[in-house]
Swiss-Prot record:
Keywords: DNA-binding. Residues 115-204 are annotated as: Disordered. PANTHER family: OB FOLD NUCLEIC ACID BINDING PROTEIN-RELATED, SOSS COMPLEX SUBUNIT B HOMOLOG. It comes from Drosophila melanogaster (Fruit fly). One of its GO terms (molecular function) is single-stranded DNA binding. Residues 122-131, 139-183 have a biased composition (Low complexity). This is SOSS complex subunit B homolog. GO terms for biological process: DNA repair; double-strand break repair via homologous recombination; mitotic G2/M transition checkpoint; response to ionizing radiation. One of its GO terms (cellular component) is nucleus.
Amino acid sequence: MYNVECIPIKDIKPGLKNINVIFIVLEVGVATVTKENREVRNFKVGDPTACINVSIWDEPGKLIAPGDIVRLTKGYASIWRHCLTLYSGKNGEVFKIGEYCMVFNESVNMSEPKRAEQQAVANPAATPAGLPAGGGAPGLPAKGGATGIPQPAVAAAPGAPATQSAVTTAPAAAPAIAPQTTTKPGTRGGRGGGGRGGLKGERR
């Protein structure tokens, strides 16, 4: 299909000149008349590698129909309305060399606008937003204790024994002892007892 002079459509790039290519016409667009009273027609054409939009000036554009196999020489490619377009040059020629018998590829459209892909810059070393510095889950405290309760820092001198918390216990109260009362035997006075005996002794 391609000789030394012709290139496949997939290799056409913006700014490329002296393009020689063979393609089959797929669609014919509406003619546009310029201020210089020149007529230009847009075509969608394809070959086995890709398809592209072609603008052909003046009389050759009027003679081309869908299904024609065309050889275009000394064309150039540029961007028009964000689309890659192939143009017939002033010194170029357009030849019809056949009809219908050509394989073409429409899945690769060189004239589709190329949208710039936005790439998100991810920094794996950065701490994700919303996570605490300790690495815990959002809403949970980092290692060390519950939220809002400060943990005491205990610093021990090197070589000192571990300090144990001293617990002071209050001494147990002694059981209360009830006071004992001493009862002395009462002395009978008057007539009874020793007084009476004494009197008897004196009488004897």
